[in-house]
From Swiss-Prot:
GO cellular component, one term: apical plasma membrane
Segments on the Extracellular side according to the record's topology features: 91-579
Transmembrane residue ranges: 70-90
The species this protein was found in: Homo sapiens
Name by which UniProt lists this protein: Membrane frizzled-related protein
Effect of residue 517 to W: Found in a patient with high hyperopia; uncertain significance
Length: 579
């Protein structure tokens, strides 16, 4: 067998007719090169080419396999490009537009969590009022508390303007620059209204000075100008009656540069007053400026009436009376006489508590002080009023809202020894007339209570309206009967009291709980007398509870909620109760 170390196939011309193999190992070094091969002219004759040269004529590539690879690679590339474009578009949509806030807040407010959220307020120029006038209405933050650290901002009760939830305790900390002060305005208010704002309330406290203002009801307070850079706002609700809450704004201002709304009166100490507090007979400003020039403001309204009889009426009588009026008629007749007063064509704005437009009638007592006979409003005229002395004062007041036709009134002086009462009326011992239907109704209609002195044969003893105390928290007091409805706090049944007191179970852990319980039960479940009337707790009960509980409530962030001076003293055992 012949072993070749190298084989070279040389093809030069198509004219070569034969193929020669050359092995350099057997050739001389100076020998001639490999002669060119000679191929026959027959075209049918072919020589296969080496694999490292041109392809043989009889072999073709697999084109279908190549195009399949190209198609797969192209599809993969397009898929990657589409994914990249989608990612870029998503990032562009998520990015805030130029000039927008870096911490945008949703229109519905932040979701309330167990931790106190931090709320970044708007940094745009202009006051909140200016923003509203320009048509920009920022969405109020309805979260339950938080930190308000911007130079201005809005906040509101949870769910506003829908009713706020029960058992709520929200705390907002308003913080502005230390060289600025805070101005705050409550634009809308609807919170359960009870004396001293005992149940639902909004408290404003500039820190570290302490409590300043407690708010409830439906009338927003005037603009508040403070001298503090940190304001604490607390909103508390119990488990029963609800309202739609409040909506407020604040802004930073230079100290001493506060302002008031266009319909408010400004005192020189940056105190703002509502129109109802101007020319009301009480100096609210330190310089008394709110009670000056009142006669010019209410010209043709009120006056002194000294004749034995006379007539007076509201401005623009039988037409719409003006807004923001304060008229006072002083009726004075000779001593030894009394005054009978009657109203005609009575038409004032109606409201359950006569808070807006109303008439008040006062009479003088033996000491010369004025005492209130009654406040009246609506379309039903007041009853005939008879004074026990020779002086009466009639006060007519209107607000800036609804107006009506007003009234006219006549008065007549008569000798105090005469009886001016009609056939269906009985006279009070201290003077005045009351209808027979009001006698022995367990309510003191006469100022001296003589209408309920029912021991005589004319009036049989009334049926007792007392009922057993059923409120668990108030069992074991010095009395065991009460009477409802309770007009002091506006509760109809004891079941309502149970619902209210359920929000105060947390106070049972306080060392002063028993003192606070006596006061709270004395107010909500008052003592019932044998005649069916009720007695409030004595002032000493309230003062003792305040002394024992004030510091403990302060630790809970709640100031003392009662004004003890509104309760009677214990000098008269029939005037108050010791629960």
């Amino acid at each position: 067998m012949k072993d070749f170390s190298d084989v070279i196939l040389c093809m030069e011309a198509t004219e070569s007719s034969k193929t020669e193999f050359c092995n350099p190992a057997f050739e001389p070094e100076s020998g001639p090169p490999c002669p060119p091969p000679v191929f026959p002219e027959d075209a049918s004759y072919s020589v296969p080419a080496p694999w490292h040269g041109r392809r043989p004529r009889g072999l073709r590539p697999d084109c279908r396999f190549s195009w399949l690879c190209v198609l797969l690679l192209s599809s993969l590339l397009l898929l990657l490009l589409g994914l990249l474009v989608a990612i870029i578009l998503a990032q562009l949509q998520a990015a805030p537009p130029s000039g927008a806030s870096h911490s945008p807040l949703p229109a519905g407010g932040l979701t309330t969590t167990t931790t106190t959220p931090t709320i970044t307020t708007s940094q745009a120029a202009g006051t909140p009022k200016g923003q509203q006038e320009s048509g920009v209405s920022p969405s109020p933050q309805s979260t339950c508390g938080g930190l308000l650290s911007g130079p201005r901002g809005f906040f509101s009760s949870p769910n506003y303007p829908d009713p706020y939830p029960p058992n709520t305790h929200c705390v907002w900390h308003i913080q502005v620059a230390t060289d600025h002060a805070i101005q705050l305005k409550i634009e809308a208010l609807s919170i359960e209204s009870v004396a001293s704002c005992l149940f639902d309330r909004l408290e404003l406290s500039p820190e570290p000075e302490g409590p300043l203002l407690r708010v409830c009801g439906r009338v927003p307070p005037p603009t508040l100008n403070t001298n503090a850079s940190h304001l604490l706002v607390v909103f508390v609700s119990d488990s029963s009656v609800e309202g739609f809450g409040f909506h407020a704004w604040y802004q930073a201002m230079a100290p001493g540069r506060g302002s008031c709304a266009h319909d408010e009166f400004r005192c020189d100490q940056l105190i703002c007053l509502l129109p109802d507090s101007v020319c009301d007979g009480f100096a609210n400003c330190a310089d008394g400026s709110d009670e000056t020039n009142c006669s010019a403001k209410f010209s043709g309204c009120g006056g002194n009436l000294t004749g034995l009889q006379g007539t007076f009426s509201t401005p623009s009588y039988l037409q719409q009376y003006p807004h923001q009026l304060l008229c006072t008629w002083h009726i004075s007749v000779p001593a030894g006489h009394s005054i009978e007063l009657q109203f005609h064509n009575f038409s004032l704005e109606a409201q359950d508590e006569c808070k807006f437009d109303y008439v008040e009638v006062y009479e003088t007592s033996s000491s010369g002080a004025f005492s209130l006979l009654g406040r009246f409003c609506g379309a039903e005229p007041p009853p005939h009023l008879v004074s026990s002395h020779h002086e009466l004062a009639v006060l007519f007041r209107t607000d800036h809202g609804i107006s009506s036709g007003g009234f006219s009134a006549t008065y007549l002086a008569f000798n105090a020894t005469e009886n001016p009462c009609g056939p269906s009326e009985l006279s009070c011992q201290a003077g005045g007339c009351k209808g027979v239907q009001w006698m022995c109704d367990m309510w003191r209609d006469c100022t001296d209570g003589s209408d309920d002195n029912c021991s005589g044969p004319l009036f049989p003893p009334p049926e007792l309206a007392c009922e057993p105390v059923q409120v668990e928290m108030c069992l074991g007091l010095s009395y065991n009967t009460t009477a409802f409805p309770n007009i002091w706090v506006g509760m109809i049944t004891q079941e309502e009291v149970v619902e209210v007191l359920s929000g105060y179970k947390s106070l049972t852990s306080l060392p002063c709980y028993q003192h606070f319980r006596r006061l709270l039960c004395g107010l909500l479940v008052p003592r019932c007398t044998p005649l069916g009337s009720v007695l409030p707790p004595c002032r000493s009960v309230c003062q003792e509870a305040e002394h024992q509980c004030q510091s403990g409530l302060a630790l809970l962030g709640t100031p003392w909620p009662f004004n003890c001076n509104r309760l009677p003293e214990a000098a008269d055992l029939e005037a108050c109760a010791q629960p």
